[in-house]
């Protein structure tokens, strides 16, 4: 009688952990994409500044 709710609770905790882990992975992927986009913006900004700087010489 006691074992059934306990095993149910364990399954519930495992499912919750799986959900949290998948959300965490999704957040990491989104963060990685955001960093990639930001780096591209910074890179293009630096390139345009360098071109402008060389054209002024």
Swiss-Prot record:
Coiled coil: none annotated. Pfam families: IBV_3A. The keyword Signal applies. Keywords: Host-virus interaction, Inhibition of host innate immune response by virus, Interferon antiviral system evasion, Signal, Viral immunoevasion. InterPro entries: IBV_3A. It comes from the Viruses. Residues 1-22 form the signal peptide. The keyword Membrane does not apply. GO terms for biological process: symbiont-mediated suppression of host innate immune response. Involved in resistance to IFN. This is Non-structural protein 3a. It comes from Avian infectious bronchitis virus (strain Portugal/322/82) (IBV).
């Amino acid at each position: 009688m006691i074992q059934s709710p306990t095993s149910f609770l364990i399954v519930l905790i495992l499912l919750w952990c799986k959900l949290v882990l998948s959300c965490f992975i999704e957040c990491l992927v989104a963060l990685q994409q955001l960093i990639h986009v930001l780096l591209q913006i910074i890179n293009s900004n630096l390139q345009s500044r360098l071109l402008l700087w060389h054209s002024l010489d």
